[in-house]
From Swiss-Prot:
Superkingdom, natural source: Bacteria
EC id: 2.3.1.117
Any one of the GO CC terms: cytoplasm
The protein, known as: 2,3,4,5-tetrahydropyridine-2,6-dicarboxylate N-succinyltransferase
Organism name: Escherichia fergusonii (strain ATCC 35469 / DSM 13698 / CCUG 18766 / IAM 14443 / JCM 21226 / LMG 7866 / NBRC 102419 / NCTC 12128 / CDC 0568-73)
Length: 274
C-alpha cells in the first residue's frame, strides 16, 4: 500500500502536466487501483482511529488525479446519455451482483464509480459522488445528495432533499462525516467537513457549515464544525451584541442517549423541544 501511495503522491506533484493523452501507465494503473479499492470499501477517505477521525489525503489526491487521466466518454443511462470522466458504479452490474452485494437502488438513483455502498442500504432517487462511503443499513432518501468523499455511518437516515457536502478541494479540507445512527431531516444541509456525531437528530431545514454557531441552550456553549453525540438540533437565531439584529444558528435543544432513542420515535424527539 505504501508503494501505491508513493506513486499517487509523486504524480500529484506534477498533476498540472498530466493529461489523458500523456498519463503514464504506472500512474494510470495506480489511480485506477485506488478508485477500485474505494469502490469496494477496502479503502476509505476518512476513518475513525482511536476515537478520532483521520483523513487520508493521498486518497483524495488519487480521486483528483482520476479527473486528469480520464477523458470524457459517453455514458449510457436509462432515459438519456451522459458525457463525463467518471463512469457510473452500476454500469456493469447484473442481477447476481446486486443480489450478492445486498443493497437496493431505486431508479433514477445515480452513484459514481469510486463510491462504496454497503449491504442493506437503500438508495431512493438520489446521488452519491465519487469517494463517498455509505455504511450498512442507511437510507438515502429521494433527492438527497452525498458529496464527494463524504462518510455516512451505519443506520443513518438522510431524508428527502438532504445535502451532505463534498470535499475534494482545497486538499487539506476534511470530508463531511455523519456518524452511526443519525437522522438528518428533510432539506437540511451539512457541509464543509462538519462532523455530526453518533446518535444525533437534525431537524428539517437545518444548515450547518464550519462557520455556523451550534448553540447548546442547556449549557450556553457554542460549538463550531461538530454536533456533539446524541444532540437534537433545530434551526434558530442568536441576537447580536447590540440587540439590533439576529443571525442564524443551529440550536441543540436537548441530548438523548441510545436508550431514549430506542423508546421514543424521531418525530416525538423533535416535537417535544420545549
Amino acid at each position: 500500500m505504501q508503494q501505491l501511495q508513493n506513486i499517487i503522491e509523486t504524480a500529484f506533484e506534477r498533476r498540472a502536466e498530466i493529461t489523458p493523452a500523456n498519463a503514464d501507465t504506472v500512474t494510470r494503473e495506480a489511480v485506477n487501483q485506488v478508485i477500485a479499492l474505494l469502490d469496494s470499501g477496502a479503502l476509505r477517505v476518512a476513518e475513525k482511529i482511536d476515537g478520532q477521525w483521520v483523513t487520508h489525503q493521498w486518497l483524495k489526491k488519487a480521486v483528483l488525479l482520476s479527473f486528469r487521466i480520464n477523458d470524457n466518454q459517453v455514458i449510457e443511462g436509462a432515459e438519456s446519455r451522459y458525457f463525463d470522466k467518471v463512469p457510473m458504479k452500476f454500469a456493469d452490474y447484473d442481477e447476481a451482483r446486486f443480489q450478492k452485494e445486498g443493497f437496493r437502488v431505486v431508479p433514477p438513483a445515480a452513484v459514481r464509480q469510486g463510491a462504496f455502498i454497503a449491504r442493506n442500504t437503500v438508495l431512493m432517487p438520489s446521488y452519491v459522488n465519487i469517494g463517498a462511503y455509505v455504511d450498512e443499513g442507511t437510507m438515502v432518501d429521494t433527492w438527497a445528495t452525498v458529496g464527494s468523499c463524504a462518510q455516512i455511518g451505519k443506520n443513518v437516515h438522510l431524508s428527502g432533499g438532504v445535502g451532505i457536502g463534498g470535499v475534494l478541494e482545497p486538499l487539506q479540507a476534511n470530508p463531511t462525516i455523519i456518524e452511526d445512527n443519525c437522522f438528518i431531516g428533510a432539506r437540511s444541509e451539512i457541509v464543509e467537513g462538519v462532523i455530526v456525531e453518533e446518535g444525533s437528530v437534525i431537524s428539517m431545514g437545518v444548515y450547518i457549515g464550519q462557520s455556523t454557531k451550534i448553540y447548546d441552550r442547556e449549557t450556553g456553549e457554542v460549538h463550531y464544525g461538530r454536533v456533539p453525540a446524541g444532540s437534537v438540533v433545530v434551526s434558530g437565531n442568536l441576537p447580536s451584541k447590540d440587540g439590533k439584529y439576529s443571525l442564524y444558528c443551529a440550536v441543540i435543544v436537548k441530548k438523548v442517549d441510545a436508550k431514549t432513542r430506542g423508546k421514543v420515535g424521531i418525530n416525538e424527539l423533535l416535537r417535544t423541544i420545549d
